[in-house]
Amino acid sequence: MDNLYTKGELLQVHTKNYDVFEGRFYSMAQDKTKISLYDVKEIPHGDANDGVLHYYDSEIREVVKLQESTEKKVLKISQTKYEEILKISKKYIFINQVDKSFHEAVDDLNQQDFIAVSGDGANMGRKCKMPFLVLSTDHQIYIFDIQVMQYHAFESGLKKILEGDSPKKIAHDCRKLSDCLYHKHNVKLKSVFDTQVGDLIITKNKKVTLPNKVKSLGECLTNYLGLQQNTIDEKLDIVQSTERPLSVKIKDSLARNIAFLHHLSEVINEEMQLPFYRGVECYIENIRSSDDFKAWELCGKLNQIPKEFRNAIDY
């Protein structure tokens, strides 16, 4: 077997039984008798396996490197999930008064472990109040018309949600959102999972140094979910955003802009945790996969880091 594979490289393992398994390179035994892959699926119709799978030289016919297009990102969202999220984005609830619908929305949001918070409407930071606030669960999007409800919206439940430890808020670049909420609406945003920060950490772990620029929400949706760049509208018309009644076009854009944030956060969180999971897998295999003599030797070195560990936790 070739030993010039890089971590994450897409490979196909062809077995002597004529089965084909496709996955990403994880590691190889020093004597090249075993290759390990993750994100493995059986070709052509198998589902992806979450764990690390091992293939031995005695069962392998050949290992094939697959070329991936540099233009097309690896799609990490199924067509079914994509269509499901689009349906959710079209069934948003627009709220412009503190009534039964408002309180039902607040109750629904409070029952969640995570909610998404859109930065749309806070583009000017502390220079002006937010015309709207968009929050969502993983199944329902709510557009609150702050321009109409004013401070009543925050006093009636939104402030408590945004300032509370729970639910945790998912945002992409919360800087201006936090600034606007604090200086214009007396709301101190707390307990945030920021997907832009997550992307920076992943990039630093992969490239050692931080990038010069941050990625927009659209860029992250393309990088992590494989979505088209024009899936969302990142440049909402400021004038139209303050006109009332709020146009259907603006409301549709607001809903679509937040719709994929939950799934994006899951993918980014999973990728941030990847070195940890690989490190644990290394520990699981370290002694177990050794012969008796080697296992005895390793048991006497438990105060040392396994030789394979550093390679295992690299992206």
Curated annotation (Swiss-Prot):
Q: Which GO terms describe its cellular component?
A: P granule; PET complex
| InterPro entries according to UniProt | 3'-5'_exonuclease_dom, piRNA_biogenesis_EXD1, RNaseH-like_sf, RNaseH_sf
* Role: RNA-binding component of the PET complex, a multiprotein complex required for the processing of piRNAs during spermatogenesis. The piRNA metabolic process mediates the repression of transposable elements during meiosis by forming complexes composed of piRNAs and Piwi proteins and governs the methylation and subsequent repression of transposable elements, preventing their mobilization, which is essential for the germline integrity. The PET complex is required during the secondary piRNAs metabolic process for the PIWIL2 slicing-triggered loading of PIWIL4 piRNAs.
What protein family does this chain belong to? Belongs to the EXD1 family.
Entry keyword annotation includes Cell inner membrane: no
Source organism: Bombyx mori (Silk moth)
Cell location: Cytoplasm
Please list the residue ranges annotated as the 3'-5' exonuclease domain: 141-228
**Assembly description:** Homodimer. Component of the PET complex, at least composed of EXD1, SIWI, TDRD12 and piRNAs.
A GO BP term here is:
meiotic cell cycle
- Keyword field: Cytoplasm, Meiosis, RNA-binding, RNA-mediated gene silencing
Q: What is known of its domains?
A: The 3'-5' exonuclease domain lacks the conserved Asp-Glu-Asp-Asp (DEDD) residues that coordinates divalent ions essential for exonuclease activity.
Q: What is its main location?
A: cytoplasm
The UniProt GO MF terms for this protein read: protein homodimerization activity; RNA binding
Protein name as it appears in the record: piRNA biogenesis protein EXD1
Pfam families (alphabetical): DNA_pol_A_exo1 (PF01612)
